[in-house]
UniProtKB/Swiss-Prot annotation:
Organism: Staphylococcus epidermidis (strain ATCC 35984 / DSM 28319 / BCRC 17069 / CCUG 31568 / BM 3577 / RP62A)
Domain notes: The EIIC type-3 domain forms the PTS system translocation channel and contains the specific substrate-binding site.
Induction (record text): Induced by lactose, galactose and galactose-6-P. Repressed by glucose.
Membrane topology of this protein: Multi-pass membrane protein
Keyword rRNA processing assigned: no
Residue positions, PTM Phosphocysteine: 486
Name of the protein: PTS system lactose-specific EIICB component
Gene: lacE
Length: 582
């Protein structure tokens, strides 16, 4: 098993390169920007259709009133994502351009939205246009519009093809004329594509694209498709790669289209049979976090003999219940641990097989409601599928099955740890260092340390490689703003908080903030230093183009080093100081 994992890790650079692809990243970040709209609209689905389960049905008039906010938000999500995706892709292209010759992201957003209307909207007799393909049905077309828009803009801006204005003309006026050529080219190209589609296949581009990808959508919803998709999430995470960065952009259009299709099927009184949805990913395949780990902390707490494992279980129960499973992933650890390779990969797959059986054979409705990913898995299953009877059975069954899958491997691992404890050996040092080098383990480490489950020696927190100094914090004399970036923005808060606390204690002019990689472009100019957490350290060369252009210092950290910095605020301040001395 160790040889298998070592062989798998050899492919890590290739997959990391895929995860940094600017087009995949644009899709992911475009969706992230639209999440508030999607969450808001789902509230009205719950209000409108959940009462049906209890025998209460709204009148058609009231149903129309309640669903209007949904139709006017989620109903145009394709239109909105065209703009947000274009904005994200524009940021990526601007990294490669001279700082005095940048693409105007506001212009690309407007052009992508206008172009999307050409590709997805049909005129209606009374004026205006149909919105049938402006929602999730138009997502693939939204990506096409965004990509073509930014590529065309890059062509014009890079070659400085523009209407040149005298230097006396204000910059905002010059920008208007600079955008005329690329915007016109985008509209004409996408309009020509629309005319071509209507002439050849007699429908708009959005509908034509859906027809082309329909077999793929069907295949993805099949047994092999769901196995590959949800197995990949766990596989990539196990070997140290942020799986969602690779898998989610590839299936985003399918999942959200299926979610809306399921809703329409329920509205029509039919069976909602589309399996691949956001809820399937969040509450079935990754119930309790990647690896379907909801049951694992409870098993560590109740079914192990090792004191260390019991402590880790107690510390991990609450966060894992809400889908934050870093404490058990990195505390046990589960990832990069040969003992847990099989259950970590196959528990999500078995979960999705059971769910598909319930949908296909028992005629249970699939997910039709979008819920926050922090919703506890069993509750997410019940709420997301409309409180159906079978959803309660499914939630209980998945818990039982996951316990059965993990149990034999847990016993093997517990015996290993127990033997080490009885022999006064330091447990799994090599494995823990490997995990720290491959993952951003700061959140897990902090939670475990607080709960008394960490085995880290206190001396570790006072020797942060080359960053410790007891007299250097007073050398930072000017106001220094620091931005800490991680994959999602949540866990980077630990280092930011450590810096702020130490800065206040030692009266050092340092202010730190946490953020997520991909959402940093608009705010990074306000900082003098950006620190990359280990999870996003592979993006160092990409972001360095931005920081060099803006005159900002950039630093990346490794796993063990980062953990120690989050524990020792003084060492974190010294780390900041050293970046300006290098």
């Amino acid at each position: 098993m160790n040889k298998l994992i070592a062989w798998i890790e050899k492919g890590k650079p290739f997959f990391e390169k895929i995860s940094r692809n600017i087009y995949l990243r644009a899709i992911r970040d475009g969706f992230i920007a639209a999440i508030p709209i999607i969450l808001f609209s789902s509230i009205f689905i719950l209000i409108t259709y959940v009462p049906n389960v209890f025998g209460f049905t709204w009148s058609k008039t009231m149903e129309g009133i309640l669903m209007k906010p949904y139709n006017y938000t989620m109903g145009i999500v394709g239109l909105l994502v065209a703009g947000t995706t274009a904005k994200s892709l524009t940021d990526s292209y601007n990294r490669k351009l001279d700082k005095t010759n940048q693409i105007n992201f506001i212009s690309t957003m407007m052009a992508a939205i206008c172009g999307f209307l050409f590709l997805a909207a049909d005129p209606v007799k009374d004026g205006g246009f149909s919105s049938a393909f402006m929602g999730t049905k138009g997502l693939l077309t939204a990506f096409i519009s965004a990509f073509i828009t930014v590529i065309v803009y890059n062509f014009f801006v890079k070659r400085n093809i523009t209407i040149k204005m005298p230097k006396e003309v204000p910059p905002n006026i010059s920008q208007v004329f600079k955008d005329i050529f690329p915007l016109s080219a985008v509209i004409l190209i996408l309009y020509a594509l629309d005319l071509l589609s209507r002439a050849i296949v007699h429908t708009n581009v959005a509908n034509a694209v859906l027809k082309v990808f329909e077999p793929l959508f069907t295949a993805a919803d099949g047994w092999i498709g769901v196995t590959l998709i949800f197995g990949a999430f766990a596989f990539f995470w196990f070997v140290g790669i942020h799986g969602p960065s690779i898998v989610e952009p590839a299936i985003a259009a399918i999942t959200y289209a299926n979610l809306e299709t399921n809703l329409h099927l329920i509205q029509a009184g039919e069976h909602a049979d589309k399996v691949i949805t956001p809820g399937t990913q969040m509450f079935v395949a990754t119930m309790g976090g990647t690896g379907a780990t909801l049951v694992v902390p409870f098993m560590f707490m109740w079914l192990t003999k090792s004191k260390r494992n019991k402590a880790i279980g107690r510390a991990s129960v609450v966060p894992t219940f809400f889908g934050v499973n870093e404490p058990i992933l990195f505390g046990a650890p589960l990832v990069l641990n040969p003992v847990f390779f099989i259950p970590f990969i196959f528990a999500p797959i078995v979960n999705i097989w059971i769910f598909k059986f319930f949908v296909d054979v028992l005629n249970m409705n699939s997910f039709s409601i979008f819920l926050p990913w922090t919703t506890p898995g069993p509750l997410g299953i019940v709420m997301g599928t409309g409180f159906a009877f079978w959803s309660f059975v499914l939630a209980i069954l998945l818990i039982v099955v996951d316990v059965i899958i993990y149990y034999p491997f847990l016993k093997v691992y517990d015996e290993q740890v127990l033997e080490e404890e009885l022999g006064n050996k330091e447990a799994n040092n090599e494995l823990k260092e490997k995990v720290s080098a491959n993952f951003d383990t700061k959140k897990a480490d902090a939670i475990l340390a607080t709960a008394g489950a960490s085995e880290a020696d206190t001396d570790d927190t006072s020797s942060v490689d080359e960053t410790t100094s007891t007299s250097s914090t007073d050398t930072i004399s000017e106001q220094t703003n620091v931005l800490v970036l991680c994959a999602g923005g949540g866990t980077s808060g630990l280092l930011a908080n450590a810096l702020n606390k130490a800065a206040e204690e030692y009266e050092v002019p340092v202010k730190a903030a946490a953020g997520g990689y991909g959402a940093h472009m608009d705010i990074m100019k306000d900082y003098q230093l950006i620190i990359l957490a280990p999870q996003v350290a592979s993006n160092f060369e990409d972001i360095k183009q931005d920081t060099d252009r803006l005159g900002i210092k950039l630093a990346k950290t490794e796993g063990a080093q980062y953990i120690k910095l989050t524990r020792d605020g003084e060492a974190a301040l010294e780390f900041v100081k050293q970046q300006f001395n290098n």
